Regions:
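Oxidoreductase cofactor-interface core, primarily capturing Rossmann-like NAD(P)-dependent enzymes
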Residues: 1-41, 54-66, 75-85, 89-98, ...
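N-terminal beta-loop-helix "entrance" segment that forms/cooperates
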Residues: 40-48
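Cofactor-binding loops of NAD(P)H-dependent oxidoreductases
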Residues: 51
Length: 214
């Protein structure tokens, strides 16, 4: 294939978009895989190709010639895991050598958090595929907490005094770009991606109040 051998999904989103922009700025040619190619960002050295999270001839064609693949997880849905597994199968069948997967902190089969279980099973499918892998286990996104306060400014949740090392989506994208620019350094590794400090929900609420009242 004459298309770039480094491919990225989710480039129209936050983390994938940051990753694509930073790699483009480094001068790396990119194949942007998108369900709607017209929504992919127009960046120097990039080409948008139609691709969805399924194992179809279209998906395999979009992945043909890809050496390194950055897989951002699919949008939340009832069949999210099935889509992930199908996409991993398509990547392996298409000859992808190294897959960098955007996973989640503490992904495990018995995790209380549903999405962490989905990410675990996706990781296991990738390992079983024989492809080289790098798992980026992002913590909760700091940007997510900005949207949580109710009309009275409260963040309600079953967290108690639990702490979370929230990370900005922008920073998660920077980590992904760093890995994709030098993938051999991170082969078959699992990296936890967190913020600089573990905070309680009360502390997060106080920070949001301080920042938003400026």
């Amino acid at each position: 294939s004459s298309l770039p051998s480094l491919a990225i999904t989710g480039a129209s989103g936050n983390v994938g978009g940051t990753t694509a922009r930073l790699l483009s700025e480094r001068g790396l040619p990119l194949r942007l895989l998108a369900n709607t190619p017209s929504r992919a960002p127009e960046l120097p050295g990039t080409v948008a190709v139609k691709c969805s999270y399924e194992d179809t001839l279209t998906t395999r064609g979009a992945l043909e010639g890809v050496d390194i693949l950055f897989m951002v997880s699919a949008p939340e849905s009832e069949d999210r895991l099935a889509k992930h597994l199908a996409f991993v199968d398509a990547a392996a069948a298409s000859g992808v050598r190294h897959i960098v997967y955007l996973s989640f902190m503490n992904a495990a089969p018995d995790a209380t958090f549903t999405l962490a279980r989905t990410h675990f099973h996706t990781e296991e499918r990738i390992k079983a595929s024989g492809m080289t892998y790098t798992f980026l286990r992002d913590n909760f996104y700091a940007d997510f907490f900005v949207e949580l306060p109710d009309e009275e400014g409260r963040i309600l949740g079953p967290a108690g005094d639990g702490r979370v090392g929230v990370v900005a989506r922008e920073d998660a994208g920077r980590v992904a770009a760093g890995v994709l620019a030098d993938p051999a350094r991170y082969e078959n590794q699992t990296l936890d991606v967190t913020g600089p400090e573990a905070l309680t929900l009360d502390e997060i609420a106080a920070i949001l109040t301080r920042v938003q009242s400026r």
